[in-house]
């Protein structure tokens, strides 16, 4: 039998593009809702869920012994981080992206294919993100289907086609082309002298989340206990459960997780989000 351990690290809130959490409670983080539904489908599969931001430390802690990495992210900074990590540790990773009605997919295999960074300069159009143009569900379905086919091939020892797939579900266009010759010998990830520049431990404490009018902020010194005590002392109404605490401050909805991670809704400006956090906690 094939033993598969699945690690989930997803966005926090329910999204109408996602089928997986349709029966889960709205108050649950998406990653927990996904874990719950998947366990109901396959009780014999072990599924670990992490309500964390993917950064260098997360990958070093949880990604060292995986067989493949399946990309479901929505920004290129995280993909470049995954790309460096995957090539440093010789782990195949499967890229997938969606913009409006277009879909893109490619599987990167260290030692066999050029990496994500080698491919990027040839494809400037895929630098658009859902933050500015949005997506439609059929394009999401097409992307994930292509990714899952390659994942099944890798897990079962079958040959993966080393090509890049691009298409538009709206117009019906679909293209594939090989990218083996795109390797850059000077690439800092897969070239002759790799330095893996995106694998640094000094990550920013904030990030704007794609298409969500939200800024993520992290301060490890603010535990859930400290937060709840602060909210009680200042008579700020809040809701809390095992996973997160939700409250409002100056017309902004704020969601806090263990480990000092906060989502500040209602702004895309990190500077404004940081000011709000300083007003709250000094």
Give the positions of each predicted feature.
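Adenine nucleotide-associated cytosolic modules
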Residues: 1-282
